Structure formats: structure tokens, C-alpha cells
């Protein structure tokens, strides 16, 4: 909130190249952050916390590298690094109030970090909150940097950390649960379905093994995009040339970030590409969208197989977690499936946002950076959270309704497929169509038509033998 909107807030005067401006006295931010608060009253979406923490990593690493290169007084550099470490730890999240909808380079958020960290460092060195002495937001915290390379670097750091520390473990958790169900259900034979119609048999375990494989492959595709995300733009400064940065800064900076995060970050080979495009994040979002597609299918299958309890497919019983209706007593809904599919719908929408925003690299700079960062980070976070929720509150508690599965299996006309190799497709189709028309069983019609004997039918039409290739 602007101090002008709340006169009771005590203020101090800060200044930038536009002149003086009043800032809440208890806040660590300065003039440029305050101007952004006043100029961009758009929505409620603040810069994501992982991005704020990543900006802290950038400032911490830059200060330490600049100290090593002789570009910063050691006392100032250490004060900046220590203050930035507090930002990384989330101790000052409430000092980062800026919304996503700001300048497309993220300049205001970069300056928000510079101002807060400089203010913290000034207090460390015996100075006062705010101001520009002894630590200056631009001259010291932003030394050898531009918003144009700092913000994309923070984007990559934030996304890589979230994928590595949050999403991939969540997918592993889901995969483990689905794989356990595949093994638990491996001996339960059920009717398969294609085009929403009866098909030949599968085991329930085989069906779940497909889900498990889909999750594993989705995670692998996401992991395969990380090398591009681990390449950092820092050192390109304003347009990719590296103006005002030490020749060794970029490589040393990437190594320092790798040391601080434990992730193998590198310096981007071509800084012009790293500033003007966000293809690496578009690529990652594509993999996230593919994962969302797969998770939607899995959740949809499970809720359909659990439909009922008396008038649906009813092959599965899903955990009953909460009442499902305010008007229908006793109704329970597949809420975890619904939550996951809504997450997937959001991620698919984010894919459209990121693809379009990624195309907006006009000349030397893409200026849709904050919306790309927000969309990708949201995709990663909600996919991770939903995967854990779906696992813990649904998948682990799924039970097979074996009586219902057996009943549906015994009435399926598609078991006739097993007869096709011996009597031919046309005769097998005739048996199925006649049984459907007359309301009789396959066996009754096969014997009446004289195409097989009782012994032949019993030997061939056995669902448990129809789950794998056969030489017979």
C-alpha cells in the first residue's frame, strides 16, 4: 500500500532519478519499488516467492564474485552477501510486494531486490534503513549486472530449483504409488475399453502399469529440458555484450551459483540468445503441458472406473474423503481427480501463455519475462502439489471391486476376439452380433451356429490367457 493511501503510516523520504518519494519508514525497500507499487495497481499476483529467493541468490553470488575480482570492498560485499542470504531463506518475503504485471524486463523487481538488500546491508554496517550509503543499490548490489541479464538468470534459477526439489520428487512419489497398485492388481482380469466401448481383456495391473509408465516418462521428459534451464544469462548485461561486467564475471558467477545451490548451473554460451529469447522455458513448459495431458488422462480414467457407486462402471472404489453434496445426503465425489484435472487445465492454459510470451523477443530483449516466470513457476508448483495430494488422498487408497469387474467381464461380447484366429473374423463377428441381438451369451450362439464345440470354446475363450501375445 502506498503511504499516500494510508496517512497514518510513518514515512521516510527516498529518491531516485525522478526525484523524492515517500516510503513507509518500517520497510526496507526504496524509491523504485515504491514507484512500482503506485504505478502498477494491477491484480493481486505478486512475484512468486521462488523468484524472489532466486534474486537473492543472484545478488549473493554477484557480491562474492565481485569481491574476488576486486570490484567490491570486502566489507560491503560480505554485507550484501549476508543480507542476500536472508532473502534466499525467505526471511524478508514481505519486503517484495511487486506484482507480476510490471515492466517486461522485471526491472522493478530487480531494483526491489537491490534496494532491500542494500538497506539490510547498510544496517549491518551500522547505517540506517534505506538510503544509499555506505551500500548503494545500483553501484554495489547491481554491480556488473543489468536487469536484462539478472531477471532471466533468476527465472532459470527459480525454475530449476522448483523442478529439482519439488516437482520431480512429487512425480517419483506418484509413480511409486501407481507402480505398487499395478503389482497389487496384476492378477485381476477385467475388460479393456477403446473408444469408450468394450474391447479385449487386460489386467487391472496392466492398466495401472500404463499409468505408472506415463508418469515416469513425463518426469523424464521434464528432466531432459533442464540443461537449457541450467544455462544462465548473467554476464550479458544490457544487450548481451557484457558491457560493464568483468571478463571473468559470467563464468565465475555461474560457478558460484552452482556452489550455492548444489545444481550444475553454467554460463550460457550465447548471451544474446539468453536475453532475447526464453526458448528453454518454452521447451520446459511444453514438457509440463505434456505431463498435464498425461495426468488428466490418468485422473479421468480413475474417476470413470470409480463411477457409481451403483449406476456407473464401479470397477474401482476411491477413498471417501469428504461429503460431496449440500443437497444429496450420502453423496461422495472423486474430488482428488477433479482437483488434479483442474490443475492440468490451468497448466495447459499456461502453455499457451508461455508460448506466446516466448515469441515476444523483440531485437535484443524479450519483454514478457515476469509473465513467463509466473506461468512456468505456477505450473511446476501446482503439478507438484496436485501429484502429492492425488497420491496421498486417492491413489494409495484405491480398491478393486472384483465382483463388479468379474460380472462386467463375463458379459463382454469382445471375448469373441479369441475365436477369430481359428474360425475367422466374419464368423466371430456373427457370433457377437447375434448374441447382442438375442440377449444370449457368446457360448450359446457359438454352439448354436455350430462354429465351435463346447470343449473348443472353453479352451479358447479364457480371459486370463488373453493378456499377452500368443503363438497359438
From Swiss-Prot:
Site, as annotated: Important for catalytic activity: 338
Record-annotated residues binding substrate?
105-107, 136-139, 146-148, 194, 326, 331-333
What reaction does this catalyse?
(S)-malate = fumarate + H2O
User: Which pathway does UniProt place it in?
Assistant: Carbohydrate metabolism; tricarboxylic acid cycle; (S)-malate from fumarate: step 1/1
Report which superkingdom the organism of origin falls in.
Bacteria
Residues annotated as the enzyme's active site: 195 (proton donor/acceptor), 325
Q: Supply the EC number(s).
A: 4.2.1.2
Q: Which UniProt keywords apply?
A: Cytoplasm, Lyase, Tricarboxylic acid cycle
Instruction: Give Gene Ontology CC terms.
Output: cytoplasm
For biological process, the GO terms are:
fumarate metabolic process; malate metabolic process; tricarboxylic acid cycle
Q: What's the stated role of this polypeptide? A: Involved in the TCA cycle. Catalyzes the stereospecific interconversion of fumarate to L-malate.
Which NCBIfam families is this protein grouped with? fumC_II, PRK12273.1
Designated name of the protein: Fumarate hydratase class II
Biological source species:
Methylorubrum extorquens (strain ATCC 14718 / DSM 1338 / JCM 2805 / NCIMB 9133 / AM1) (Methylobacterium extorquens)
Source taxonomy lineage?
A: Bacteria, Pseudomonadati, Pseudomonadota, Alphaproteobacteria, Hyphomicrobiales
Amino acid at each position: 500500500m502506498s503511504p499516500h493511501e494510508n496517512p497514518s503510516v510513518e514515512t521516510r523520504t527516498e529518491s531516485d532519478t525522478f526525484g523524492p518519494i515517500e516510503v513507509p519508514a518500517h520497510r526496507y525497500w526504496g524509491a523504485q519499488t515504491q514507484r512500482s507499487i503506485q504505478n502498477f495497481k494491477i491484480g493481486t499476483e505478486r512475484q512468486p516467492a521462488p523468484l524472489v529467493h532466486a534474486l537473492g541468490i543472484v545478488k549473493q553470488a554477484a557480491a562474492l564474485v565481485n569481491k574476488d575480482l576486486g570490484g567490491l570492498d570486502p566489507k560491503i560485499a560480505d554485507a550484501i552477501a549476508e543480507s542476500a542470504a536472508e532473502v534466499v531463506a525467505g526471511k524478508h518475503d514481505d519486503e517484495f510486494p511487486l506484482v507480476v504485471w510490471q515492466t517486461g524486463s522485471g526491472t522493478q523487481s530487480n531494483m526491489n531486490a537491490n534496494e532491500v538488500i542494500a538497506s539490510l546491508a547498510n544496517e549491518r554496517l551500522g547505517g540506517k534503513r534505506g538510503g544509499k550509503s555506505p551500500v548503494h543499490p545500483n553501484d554495489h548490489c547491481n554491480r556488473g549486472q543489468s536487469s536484462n541479464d539478472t531477471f532471466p538468470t533468476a527465472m532459470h534459477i527459480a525454475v530449476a530449483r522448483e523442478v529439482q526439489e519439488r516437482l520431480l520428487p512429487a512425480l517419483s512419489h506418484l509413480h511409486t504409488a501407481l507402480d505398487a497398485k499395478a503389482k497389487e492388481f496384476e492378477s485381476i482380469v477385467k475388460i479393456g475399453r477403446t473408444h469408450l466401448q468394450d474391447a479385449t481383456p487386460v489386467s487391472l495391473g496392466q492398466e495401472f502399469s500404463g499409468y505408472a509408465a506415463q508418469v515416469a516418462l513425463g518426469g523424464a521428459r521434464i528432466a531432459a529440458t533442464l540443461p537449457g534451464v541450467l544455462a544462465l544469462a548473467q554476464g550479458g548485461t544490457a544487450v548481451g555484450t557484457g558491457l560493464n561486467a568483468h571478463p571473468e564475471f559470467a563464468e565465475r558467477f555461474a560457478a558460484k551459483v552452482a556452489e550455492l545451490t548444489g545444481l550444475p548451473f553454467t554460463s550460457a554460451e550465447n548471451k544474446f540468445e539468453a536475453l532475447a529469447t526464453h526458448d528453454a522455458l518454452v521447451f520446459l513448459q511444453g514438457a509440463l503441458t505434456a505431463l498435464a495431458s498425461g495426468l488428466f488422462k490418468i485422473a479421468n480414467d480413475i474417476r470413470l472406473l470409480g463411477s457409481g457407486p451403483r449406476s456407473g462402471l464401479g470397477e474401482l472404489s476411491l477413498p471417501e474423503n469428504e461429503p460431496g453434496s449440500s443437497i444429496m445426503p450420502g453423496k461422495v465425489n472423486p474430488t482428488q481427480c477433479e482437483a488434479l484435472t483442474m490443475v492440468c487445465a490451468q497448466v495447459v492454459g499456461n502453455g499457451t501463455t508461455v508460448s506466446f510470451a516466448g515469441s515476444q523477443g523483440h531485437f535484443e530483449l524479450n519483454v514478457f519475462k515476469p509473465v513467463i516466470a509466473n506461468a512456468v513457476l505456477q505450473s511446476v508448483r501446482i503439478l507438484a502439489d496436485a501429484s502429492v495430494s492425488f497420491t496421498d488422498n486417492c491413489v494409495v487408497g484405491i480398491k478393486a471391486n472384483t465382483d463388479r469387474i468379474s460380472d462386467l467381464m463375463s458379459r463382454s461380447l469382445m471375448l469373441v476376439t479369441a475365436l477369430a484366429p481359428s474360425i475367422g473374423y466374419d464368423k466371430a463377428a456373427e457370433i457377437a452380433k447375434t448374441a447382442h441381438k438375442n440377449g444370449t451369451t457368446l457360448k450359446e450362439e457359438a454352439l448354436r451356429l455350430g462354429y465351435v464345440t463346447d470343449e473348443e470354446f472353453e479352451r479358447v475363450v479364457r480371459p486370463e490367457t488373453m493378456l499377452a501375445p500368443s503363438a497359438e
